[in-house]
From Swiss-Prot:
Chief subcellular location: cytoplasm
Role, per record: Involved in the regulation of the intracellular balance of NAD and NADP, and is a key enzyme in the biosynthesis of NADP. Catalyzes specifically the phosphorylation on 2'-hydroxyl of the adenosine moiety of NAD to yield NADP.
GO biological process, one term: NADP biosynthetic process
Record organism: Francisella tularensis subsp. mediasiatica (strain FSC147)
Family per similarity comment: Belongs to the NAD kinase family.
GO cellular component, one term: cytoplasm
Active site (record annotation): D73 (proton acceptor)
Cofactor (UniProt): a divalent metal cation
Protein name from the UniProt record: NAD kinase
Matches recorded under HAMAP family: NAD_kinase (MF_00361)
Amino acid sequence: MAFKYHKVAIVGKHYKKEVSQMVETLYAYLQQQGLEIIIENDTAADTSLVNVAIASLKEIALRCDVAIVVGGDGNFLKASRLLALYSNIPVIGINKGKLGFLTTLAADDNALKNDLYAILKGDSSVTKMSMLKYRVDNNLRAPLEASIALNEIAITASRGLMFGLKVFIDGRYAFDQRGDGLIVSTPTGSTAHAMSAGGPILNPNQNSVVLVPICSHSLNSRPLVISDESVIDIYITDYNDPEPVLSIDGRHDTILKAHQKVTIQKARKKVTVLHTKDYNYYDTLREKLGWSKVLF
């Protein structure tokens, strides 16, 4: 069977020696397969490779058939989100981090010679990960890369001081909340910040988003799962200095003022992730969350 993906990009986490070594190993393996390889600019600079083709993430998205991201979930999150803004390029994650919820291929010879080989031949399963976008007071001037989230959009207190929110869903009043903040999460993000705040785990293929209160000053506040077709309007009603901040996937903090409106809805773009043919999301949950471990 011929390869389905011929022009392959490699993206790694910068300044990590073990990632750079894996990038070099991966490059050599792909060369042996006769594939065309392009390495992301900063990733290439961290290696000892010479005379290699390099490109920016935008160029990779527009020129390559597939991108392999080497690193942890954070690096995968950042790279795949940015790649998806420019094209529908599929992404493969090789884990050189800690948990590996998103980077599902192991960083070893067996994974390269069997799992990665099969995926590049087209023998794979696909997950389409939805993303969220936001705007503040209907202002559309924020850079695209700073307004799209793969995991979550969070509005949080700057120094642990409570503030007030009023939430509308599809134009209808939903609830008021005072507390440390609110997380609006995709299914992908439901195993990240949202889970730490007590939210439910959503299957990545589920067409939902979840609103998770952060330390609400009420015993009645609970996570709320809604359709990902809904439009969420969040008003900042009051706060104690300093102002609350909005972040996407833990980055790009935006300071919010009283009476400002944050509108959140599903983004048009999705991240396409390739897995092995026998990939089972529940295996990942069981392994990473220790569901099968005996505690005593």
